[in-house]
Regions:
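ALDH superfamily catalytic-core signature
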Residues: 126-131, 155-157, 166-242
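Conserved small-residue-rich beta-alpha loop and adjacent elements
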Residues: 50-134
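Hydrophobic packing residues within well-ordered alpha-helices of enzyme cores
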Residues: 17, 38, 120-123, 151, ...
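Flexible, acidic loop-helix segments that line cofactor/substrate-binding pockets
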Residues: 14-32, 146, 188-191, 198, ...
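Hydrophobic residues in well-ordered beta-strands that form the structural core
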Residues: 110-111, 142, 185-187
Length: 242
């Protein structure tokens, strides 16, 4: 229901997205890619029972006579998911994360990057006004959130997307260590694209290489985790690539 609702009003977000400095393609990835994440997780939810747990896989016999067995089950956390997000995808960054915790029945506190938080706020306002989610299941903090993880408990989850330096600082918070809080970090990455020696001009592989490198360098001005930052090309093909 949430995915369908957001898809029906998606055009509302494009004008404000442009004010973040995003091109139409950038906005399309952020807005419709984010909503697509909600659709994907909604489909995944259909694979789970309407129970507060999910039996994962088959029983594993651990003793000769079956007196000792093992069986995994999935259960939701009993706390809250705190999502600290990056500036480059104010909608996608939030939707891809909250889709997971909402599927598990876990509420979320979202802290978007201050510089583009107004776009996240618009999306959250539309979600809240729709009354599709239970009251309080999605909360937003714009601006400074200093101390946001200083009071987390064992059942809470913290996710962070941003720079490695900030992520390491958060990860070292004594409270996270003391309470064994789950911390997931997506930080700086160094991605490369490698052109094979047989991928010469005129081949589909060469054309795809040029297309993807150009796209990854220009979408969001290269400010995203999957951007190609190193291009490795056989010496004999350097001139063709240039």
């Amino acid at each position: 229901a949430l995915a369908l609702h957001l898809h029906s009003i998606k055009n509302k977000f494009y004008a404000l997205s442009a004010q973040t400095g995003a091109t139409k393609v950038d906005s399309w990835i952020d807005i419709e890619g984010g909503i697509g994440n909600v659709f994907a997780n909604a489909s995944l939810r259909k694979n789970f029972p309407d129970l507060p747990y999910h039996v994962d896989g088959d029983m594993a016999p651990l003793s000769k006579n079956g007196t000792f067995i093992g069986h995994h089950i999935m259960m939701p956390r009993e706390g809250v998911a705190i999502h600290i997000n990056a500036f480059n995808f104010p909608i996608w960054g939030m939707l891809e994360k909250i889709s997971v915790n909402l599927m598990a029945g876990v509420p979320a506190i979202v802290k978007p990057a201050t510089i583009t938080c107004y776009l996240t706020e618009m999306m959250v306002r539309e979600i809240v006004d729709s009354e599709i989610l239970p009251e309080g299941s999605l909360q937003l903090i714009c601006g400074s959130a200093r101390g946001i993880i200083d009071n987390v408990e064992t059942g809470d989850i913290v996710t962070f997307t941003g720079s490695a330096s900030t992520g390491m600082m958060l990860k070292a918070n004594p409270r996270l260590i003391e309470k064994a809080v789950s911390f997931n970090m997506e930080a700086d990455s160094l991605n490369c694209s490698v052109l094979g020696e047989d991928a010469v001009p005129g081949t589909a592989e060469f054309d795809l290489f040029i297309k993807e490198v150009q796209r990854e360098m220009t979408v969001k001005a290269g400010q995203k985790c999957t951007a190609v930052r190193r291009i490795i090309v056989p010496e004999k093909l350097v001139e063709d690539v240039q």
